[in-house]
Swiss-Prot record:
Expressed throughout the embryo, including the hindgut, posterior midgut and embryonic epidermis. GO terms for cellular component: cytoplasm; nucleus. The gene is lin. Keywords: Activator, Cytoplasm, Developmental protein, Nucleus, Repressor, Segmentation polarity protein, Transcription, Transcription regulation, Wnt signaling pathway. Residues 20-30, 65-102 have a biased composition (Low complexity). Interacts with drm. This is Protein lines. It comes from Drosophila melanogaster.
Length: 858
């Protein structure tokens, strides 16, 4: 029984069950002359239209698949305020000028009845769509045996049975829809099943008339289910879009969502003020995914409304914080959106996939294989055309099989990528449609613009740029102790957004991100021990990203002024102990260490969960003993030390770039005196940092700074390598003139740091090779500069090896690791297996090896 159709026919009859409605009309006509089924249906329509105002012809499904009887698309740009269904005509009403044979024709009325249009509560229906719906409802009198003489009991029983059947069918349809999306294909889903997840909700106005409710008026459970379905659909679309293969039906549904003008996005934006936190979370995810999918077809008003919510409030109360958090989460997800890239380790798999692609399109697969096949492989990225999609070679038989469907796919692809925006269409990047063994029709995208979100990121950043100082000021107020607990989630979202904007991974230009560096030095003043550990940690992440030394600043000749200003301020605050003392500390609770249990025993009364009186009284007497223990989070300490080292390295690099100016003589006495003052200041900062780390982590007072550094970052490879680059650059930058300032060189000594690193890795050349191949650290930059330093200061390197090992053969061990590394790299290069040009490192390794073999001191 088509219960969804039955429900649709009775939607306009108030709260009466569709089954009982049909039964009543049948009883009223029993005393008349015999009539055909069509006459009975028309009689029922006339009676219903006289008794009630016009109502929707069926439940307000978002996917209104039945009204499009002539396969004509409804205009989504020129519809009136009533938004009535388009009448069948010979003209095509679609702004996309899609032929009526298009696959998307059945989704033309997407979102037509989901929401009230422009405040109208009266809905108008078309006779054609009503006839179509009643045709299906006409089956009910023959399928249901209804006795109208049984009174209210029979009426209630039939209504209950109908509701139970409708509920069971809806659950089954919902389960089928979700399982199909899990398999990443909607090709086998019926139209009725596709409607169920997107059904709207009715409410009554002040006059007692039924109308389609706004999203904010929906029940929480139904709203959560609706938003979850949208999120799941968008997530599947984005994953397939990133890989270059999209199920045609998923593509059509998302395309219809993008082209609707029924205020759905505006209604979801209004959910920022919804009381349920789960609804807010889902609404933010849906909006972010929708904006990423829309891209060039983006409505500028959507982004503007999201940005305006950051500032449209009279006071920073809980409601304002909630809306700010909602908008920040959407903008953050847009900025941090990363296009999927192929992993270097997947090259072998891709090669085998390419060699067997033709065979895999013919050989039938099992059920499990067909499901896993829908998780399409990531396509390679040819550099010549900048396309992100891989052009698969199809055999002649495959081309013949898919030849009839190709024109339709080209029309579909052309409509999806900008024909509404009057963009000139080139036939070269047309999608290719293939039928998978599981029965899914897949479109292969070859348009690089379909994968690029740079335009969306730039628009978002530009809209936020001029209002950024105001937002920073508001966030500074929320970080006050009075607001900190209630607004911590909002502050964390803001800090993460700021970090993502200035991050190198965002692929934004320097001019676009420069305004976001201007407020960093003022924001650094907010570092305080009163902040929570999570907020403090995120602030350190923000400043470390601004001073991205290993990935960016170390490779630049001229450093940005805003970055240098932030580095100078941090160095000054370290000298005054302000920033180091601002690290939040906490007292350990029931901490178990190597020397035993440091917490207080908790004694409970027998059979209860309340503390015994003896334990409570004992607590008050022994409060002073364990409270002397102060614990500091190691992650916070790591980020703070790395931030200080980066600031020192940036300061030294800026000084060296200024002093290397051709207008300054290398023997200038005043310049040398300035360098002495700077070196003394840097040495003072490093001494205070070293003392602070030793006191916090309980190192021996005579322990060298290099050992402290290696063991502090022993669980963070990226932080460790970047810290080693900083110490190496500070040493070589300060002492670049005739090995001046030996005190600073002895304090940092990059050779000690390298030897301590080899000791920690057990002299493994394999690990060094892994770090060279990986792009997760800046080890290539470190090794290149270290080898140059060793070659220029060979005597100092040999002497440091002897003093570090206390007479042991540290020189032989260190050079043995470097020689083995050179041999491993040479073998990979000879087989053309190395991923990039490593010849500069090979030449430096050979140069150091020749010095080692000809060195008399070794």
């Amino acid at each position: 029984m088509d219960t969804s159709s039955a429900a649709g026919s009775g939607a306009g009859t108030g709260d009466v069950c569709p089954c009982s409605t049909v039964a009543t009309s049948t009883t009223s006509a029993s005393n008349e002359q015999p009539q055909t089924k069509r006459q009975k249906i028309e009689q029922q329509i006339k009676v219903g239209s006289k008794a009630l105002p016009p109502q929707p012809p069926h439940p307000p499904d978002i996917l209104d698949l039945d009204a499009n009887s002539n396969s004509h698309l409804c205009s989504s740009l020129s519809s009136s305020s009533s938004h009535s269904l388009s009448t069948p005509s010979t003209a095509n009403n679609s702004p996309t000028t899609t032929p009526c044979s298009s696959r998307a024709a059945s989704y033309a009325q997407l979102l037509h009845n989901i929401l009230p249009q422009n405040g109208d509560t009266d809905l108008h229906s078309q006779p054609e769509s009503a006839h179509d719906e009643v045709d299906r409802a006409a089956k009910l009198p023959n399928l249901l045996t209804l006795d109208t003489t049984n009174g209210n009991g029979s009426h209630a029983s039939s209504r209950s049975n109908c509701l139970q059947a409708t509920t069971a069918t809806s659950i089954d349809d919902m389960l089928e829809f979700e399982q199909s999306l899990t398999r990443q294909c909607l090709c086998g889903v019926s139209e009725r099943t596709l409607r169920k997840p997107f059904q709207s909700h009715y409410s009554q106005d002040t006059n007692g008339q039924k109308r389609i409710a706004y999203l904010r008026e929906w029940p929480t459970n139904k709203l959560l289910q609706f938003l979850s379905n949208l999120q799941l659909l968008f997530d599947i679309y984005l994953k397939q879009n990133a890989k270059g293969f999209i199920c045609t039906r998923i593509m059509d549904v998302c395309d219809a969502l993008i082209r609707n003008d029924h205020k759905l996005i505006d209604e979801i934006i209004v959910l920022a003020g919804y009381e349920n936190s789960y609804v807010q979370f889902l609404a933010g995810r849906v909006l972010a995914a929708f904006l990423v999918i829309a891209k060039q077809e983006l409505n500028d008003e959507w982004l503007q409304k999201i940005v305006d919510q950051l500032f449209n409030f009279e006071q920073l109360d809980q409601a304002a914080v909630q809306k700010i958090h909602f908008s920040l989460d959407i903008i953050k997800r847009i900025v941090e959106w990363k296009d999927m890239e192929i992993h270097p380790l997947d090259d072998d798999w891709m090669a085998s996939a390419n060699s067997t692609s033709a065979a895999s399109s013919v050989v039938p697969l099992s059920t499990e294989a067909s499901v896993s096949y829908m998780h399409f492989p990531v396509q390679e990225q040819p550099l010549a055309t900048n396309y992100f999609a891989l052009q698969f070679r199809e055999d002649t038989e495959g081309e013949r099989e898919t030849g009839q469907e190709a024109p339709d796919n080209r029309d579909r692809h052309r409509r999806h990528f900008g024909e509404d925006m009057n963009v000139a269409y080139e036939p070269h990047p047309a999608p290719q449609s293939t039928t998978m063994p599981s029965g899914c029709h897949v479109v292969t995208l070859t348009d690089s613009e379909s994968f690029d979100t740079t335009h969306l990121k730039c628009i978002t950043i530009q809209k936020l740029e001029h209002k950024w100082p105001t937002l920073v000021k508001n966030m500074s107020e929320l970080m006050a102790p009075t607001h900190q607990d209630a607004a911590e989630h909002c502050v964390l979202n803001f800090l993460q957004l700021w970090e993502n904007i200035i991050s190198v991974k965002a692929n934004l230009s320097i001019d676009e991100t420069r305004p976001y560096y201007a407020q960093l030095d003022k924001f650094e003043l907010l570092l305080s021990h009163s902040l929570s550990c999570t907020v403090y940690k995120q602030m350190l992440c923000l400043f470390n990203e601004a001073l991205c030394y290993g990935s960016t600043l170390a490779l630049q000749d001229m450093l940005p002024e805003e970055t240098c200003k932030l580095a100078h301020q941090i160095v000054c605050h370290v000298r005054g102990f302000r920033i180091l003392e601002s690290l939040p500390r906490r007292q350990p609770d029931n901490m178990v260490s190597l020397i035993g249990y440091n917490g207080k025993p908790m004694v409970y009364a027998n059979g209860t969960i309340t503390l015994a009186h003896a334990a409570q009284s004992g607590d008050s007497e022994e409060d002073g003993a364990p409270l002397d223990l102060i614990e500091m989070d190691k992650t916070l300490l790591q980020k703070m030390v790395l931030l200080v080292l980066k600031s020192i390295a940036v300061t030294v690099k800026e000084i060296r770039s200024d002093s290397s100016d051709s207008s300054i003589d290398s023997t200038d006495y005043d310049a040398f005196q300035d360098m002495m003052l700077i070196e003394r200041s840097i040495r003072d900062v490093l001494s205070k940092l070293e003392t602070f780390i030793k006191q916090t982590l309980e190192f021996h007072p005579e322990c060298h700074f290099s050992k402290i550094l290696i063991h502090l970052f022993d669980d963070q490879d990226d932080h460790l390598i970047e810290a080693m680059v900083c110490t190496l650059d500070v040493t070589s930058g300060i002492s670049f003139r005739n090995n001046a300032f030996p005190e600073l060189v002895a304090m940092l000594n990059p050779v000690y740091t390298f030897l301590e690193f080899l000791k920690m890795t057990s002299n493994s050349s394999d690990l060094l090779l892994d770090l060279l191949v990986s792009n997760e650290t800046c080890f290539l930059l470190y090794l290149l500069r270290l080898l140059k330093y060793i070659r220029m200061n060979w005597t100092m390197f040999v002497h440091s090896c002897h003093t570090f090992g206390m007479g042991s053969a540290m020189l032989d061990e260190a050079m043995g690791v470097l020689i083995r590394l050179r041999l491993q790299i040479s073998r990979l290069v000879s087989r053309q297996l190395y991923p990039y040009d490593i010849s500069p490192v090979l030449r430096l390794l050979e140069s150091c090896e020749s010095l080692y073999e000809g060195n008399e001191l070794s």
